[in-house]
Amino acid sequence: MKKFTVAALALTTLLSGSAFAHEAGEFFMRAGPATVRPTEGAGGTLGHLNGFDVSNNTQLGLTFTYMATDNIGVELLAATPFRHKVGTGATGDIATVHLLPPTLMAQWYFGDSSSKVRPYVGVGVNYTTFFDNDFNDNGKNAGLSDLSFKDSWGAAGQVGVDYLINRDWLIGASVWYMDIDTTANYKMGGVQHHDSVRLDPWVFMFSAGYRF
């Protein structure tokens, strides 16, 4: 009888340990390199300068996720500020732009709380704020000045997968597509211009995560 009781306790412990971080009421965060790859385009004067280019940039990405149920999560994406070089085919690099694109997602996780591999999809909203934008010497020599960008709201979509190492630790990969449309305000030769700009980036992130 004693051996049976010990075995039952061991089995209970094993089964209780099979629940992982992705279950109702859990909170976890991920951290890792996040790369923004714009699929850019522009109208107005910028759109006529033989192409409009925005460089890729990689920063520290952070996500914070709360599991409302075993399958439904709410996630906030944050990051250190992204720094992009902006240029055209006619001028080369002409400016540097800094931005932050915090994104709030509603997610559906496939599988259940005992699954070690949890693919997921998400939809949500992105807010992008621009700051510390300035023309470099190339831009200034071309008569450009007073650069600013209008903050943007847009939709976002996401796919990803987590591999749960144990109850507390996980590794994962995720991809977002963000609708980021803004207006570039600047002066050329002292004349004010307002050009529409489309960034619409893909964001790629590889991460390690921890449950709190």
From Swiss-Prot:
Disulfide bonds: none annotated. The gene is ompW. Belongs to the OmpW/AlkL family. GO terms for cellular component: cell outer membrane. The lineage of its organism: Bacteria, Pseudomonadati, Pseudomonadota, Gammaproteobacteria, Enterobacterales. Residues 1-21 form the signal peptide. The keyword Protease does not apply. It comes from the Bacteria. This is Outer membrane protein W.
